[in-house]
């Protein structure tokens, strides 16, 4: 009986100690970019137009988590708001603060198209059911050079 026990134990040692064969590495060829995080995917310049509300908005999101929001409602000049943004990768929720440390009027659920050319922001504020769909578009110099810089205040709040 002891011989059987020793034999079984010896076999177990050999089986358990067997090293798995190495998996072959990737075949040579063009390198594949790793999938971008949501934060990386939304970095860039975006444009939103809402004809029913008369709003024209350009949004720039930078790698260092800063934003510039150029907003024009109706006629007149674009108003520039600046601040910082952050995104929760797990819940895909975008939030931010203006330069005066005031939080945005809402956090936003974020969705980006597979080709990275469309950004949809859905306000999480109570009662808000609209979606804001932005297209990837460079902010024109005519907008950035002729805007009115605003520090957010109670008197004039942006749509963002």
Predicted features along the sequence, with ranges:
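C-terminal motif of bacterial Sec signal peptides marking the signal peptidase cleavage site
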Residues: 13-16
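Sec-dependent signal peptide recognition
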Residues: 2-7
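Lipid interaction determinants
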Residues: 18-82, 93-160
């Amino acid at each position: 009986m002891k011989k059987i026990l020793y034999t079984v134990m010896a076999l177990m040692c050999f089986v358990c100690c067997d090293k798995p064969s190495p998996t072959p590495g990737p075949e040579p060829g063009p390198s594949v970019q790793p999938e971008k995080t949501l934060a990386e995917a939304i970095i860039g310049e975006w444009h939103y137009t809402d004809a029913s509300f008369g709003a024209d908005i350009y949004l720039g999101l930078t790698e260092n988590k800063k934003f510039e929001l150029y907003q024009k409602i109706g006629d007149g000049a674009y108003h520039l708001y600046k601040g910082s943004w952050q995104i929760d990768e797990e819940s895909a929720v975008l939030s931010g603060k203006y330069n005066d440390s005031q939080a945005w009027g809402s956090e936003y659920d974020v969705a980006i198209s597979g080709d990275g050319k469309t950004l949809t922001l859905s306000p999480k504020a109570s009662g808000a059911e609209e979606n804001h769909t932005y297209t990837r578009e460079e902010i024109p110099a005519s907008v950035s050079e002729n805007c009115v810089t605003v520090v957010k205040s109670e008197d004039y709040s942006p749509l963002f």
